[in-house]
Amino acid sequence: MKKGGVRSYRRSSTSKRSVIDDDSEPELPSMTKEAIASHKADSGSSDNEVESDHESKSSSKKLKENAKEEEGGEEEEEDEYVVEKVLKHRMARKGGGYEYLLKWEGYDDPSDNTWSSEADCSGCKQLIEAYWNEHGGRPEPSKRKRTARPKKPEAKEPSPKSRKTDEDKHDKDSNEKIEDVNEKTIKFADKSQEEFNENGPPSGQPNGHIESDNESKSPSQKESNESEDIQIAETPSNVTPKKKPSPEVPKLPDNRELTVKQVENYDSWEDLVSSIDTIERKDDGTLEIYLTWKNGAISHHPSTITNKKCPQKMLQFYESHLTFRENE
């Protein structure tokens, strides 16, 4: 053989043939180790970012829910008030029953005390029962009906015309009494003269002439005596002015309410009223005064009446509820 005609083949280790079966999957192109490692690192970091975003969103949501729960709890705590004691009671203006003056726990200022109806006091029934036990028990319904407070119009001052009529009537009565006294005096003098004429002069007067005191006195003394007689006739001694009865504390059992008719005849309530309890403003703007009498009874009247009947008690109530602001 000729050397020039021989071909030489170099077999490489990387050029192996791989036999591919019909059922086997095709072989994917191979990747370097560095590419695989970088791909895994990228996929792991993206997964961590997704998980961290999800955790941050869930934690922020929980914080918001906790904040809402705390705010709701604070609002509930702020709206809680506790009744410490029942101080007084009064008849309800509408719907019957009673209203109670409540003192709240932690509020010692009397102006913070409030009136509440019996229906609104369902949470302090034990305190209400204790209050009635201290005051001799709850009154029967029949008694409460008898003590209903009728409305009374405000007392009106007499007009100048009516006052003048009363004065004229009083002067007329006085003149009639003076005339009656003078008439009796004249009749008595006539009777004495008749007896003198029938029986004759008394002993010691032989001429039958009785010298009167006026005849023996000087003219100036006679004039003074005449003026005195006129003054005595104008003011007869048998006419005595009528005295008004002194006011007395109304004698009523406890837990009864005084009506305006029972106390309107008293000129002054200063010695009858124990205390002014509270003042209430009506829908028409007028003030209603609730007060307690010294016998334990309670009542309420317009301020136009109490200002005249017990002005000192009203002044004490206003002074006790004054608040002063310090100068900064």
Swiss-Prot record:
Gene3D superfamilies per record: 2.40.50.40
Matches recorded under Pfam families: Chromo, Chromo_shadow
Compartments reported by the entry: Nucleus; Chromosome
Keywords: Chromosome, Nucleus, Phosphoprotein, Repeat, Repressor, Transcription, Transcription regulation
Bias-annotated ranges (Basic and acidic residues): 51-70, 151-194
Stored InterPro entries: Chromo-like_dom_sf, Chromo/chromo_shadow_dom, Chromo_domain, Chromo_shadow_dom, Chromodomain_CS, Heterochromatin_chromo-domain
Protein name: Chromatin-associated protein swi6
Keyword Ion transport applies: no
Domain of life: Eukaryota
Cellular component GO terms, alphabetical: chromatin; condensed chromosome, centromeric region; heterochromatin; heterochromatin island; mating-type region heterochromatin; nucleus; pericentric heterochromatin; subtelomeric heterochromatin
Biological-process GO terms, alphabetical: chromatin organization; co-transcriptional gene silencing by RNA interference machinery; donor selection; gene conversion at mating-type locus; heterochromatin boundary formation; heterochromatin formation; mating type switching; meiotic centromeric cohesion protection in anaphase I
Subunit note: Interacts with histone H3 methylated at 'Lys-9'. Interacts with the cohesin subunit psc3. Interacts with hrk1. Interacts with the CAF-1 complex at the G1/S-phase transition and early S-phase, but not in the G2 phase.
GO molecular function term, any single one: RNA binding
Residues bearing the modification Phosphoserine: 24, 220, 227, 246
Stored SUPFAM superfamilies: Chromo domain-like
Segments of this protein annotated with the region Disordered: 1-81, 132-259
Domain Chromo: 81-143, 267-328
Lineage of the organism: Eukaryota, Fungi, Dikarya, Ascomycota, Taphrinomycotina
Role this protein plays: Recognizes and binds histone H3 tails methylated at 'Lys-9', leading to epigenetic repression. Involved in the repression of the silent mating-type loci MAT2 and MAT3. May compact MAT2/3 into a heterochromatin-like conformation which represses the transcription of these silent cassettes.
